[in-house]
């Protein structure tokens, strides 16, 4: 426990185009080497491509994609008596969002399309339809938690 006061979480400014804090956070996740304007271009282009293909509102599709990627449980390593157990734990809401965004971006970076905007758009479309690499990652994490349910009593 820290002796000083607990520092609160910083408020993030909403993005300029859609006025969304979620999208601003997503831009920060995509950003590399501090190049925020490049990250914004990538995301806005990807959202335009997705909205054109789906015919829905930009943020609705992003929210649907993130909903299908958000994990509810994960495993954490816990050392008990010389052996390490994978203990299933519930994921806090802030971490759920962070993991979902990170997994979406990682999956998009591994895709084969030409530009990052197209890769991200493809991954968001796949995630919105409950398929794709990011959704598979979430299901793998859930499967690990389910397999280690016997160690749930070691939760802290």
Swiss-Prot record:
Disulphide bridges, residue numbers: none
Pfam families reported in the protein's UniProt record: Ribosomal_S7
InterPro entries found in the cross-reference section: Ribosomal_uS7, Ribosomal_uS7_bac/org-type, Ribosomal_uS7_CS, Ribosomal_uS7_dom, Ribosomal_uS7_dom_sf
Origin superkingdom: Bacteria
UniProt entry keywords in alphabetical sequence: Ribonucleoprotein, Ribosomal protein, RNA-binding, rRNA-binding, tRNA-binding
Entry annotated with the keyword Lyase: no
An example Gene Ontology biological process: translation
A single Gene Ontology CC term: small ribosomal subunit
GO-annotated molecular function: rRNA binding; structural constituent of ribosome; tRNA binding
Subunit structure: Part of the 30S ribosomal subunit. Contacts proteins S9 and S11.
Protein family: Belongs to the universal ribosomal protein uS7 family.
Function: One of the primary rRNA binding proteins, it binds directly to 16S rRNA where it nucleates assembly of the head domain of the 30S subunit. Is located at the subunit interface close to the decoding center, probably blocks exit of the E-site tRNA.
Official protein name in the record: Small ribosomal subunit protein uS7
Organismal lineage: Bacteria, Pseudomonadati, Pseudomonadota, Gammaproteobacteria, Alteromonadales
């Amino acid at each position: 426990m820290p002796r000083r006061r607990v520092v609160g979480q910083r408020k993030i400014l909403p993005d300029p185009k859609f006025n969304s804090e979620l999208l601003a956070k997503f831009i920060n996740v995509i950003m590399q080497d501090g190049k925020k304007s490049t990250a914004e271009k990538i995301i806005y282009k990807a959202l335009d491509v997705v909205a054109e293909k789906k015919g829905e509102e930009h943020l609705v599709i992003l929210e649907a994609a993130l909903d299908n990627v958000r994990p509810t449980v994960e495993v954490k390593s816990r050392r008990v008596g010389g052996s390490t157990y994978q203990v299933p734990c519930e994921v806090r809401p802030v971490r759920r969002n962070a993991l979902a965004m990170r997994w979406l971006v990682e999956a998009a970076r591994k895709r084969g399309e030409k530009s990052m905007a197209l890769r991200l758009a493809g991954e968001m479309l796949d995630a919105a339809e409950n398929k794709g690499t990011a959704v598979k990652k979430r299901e793998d994490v859930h499967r690990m938690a389910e397999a280690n349910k016997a160690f749930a009593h070691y939760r802290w």
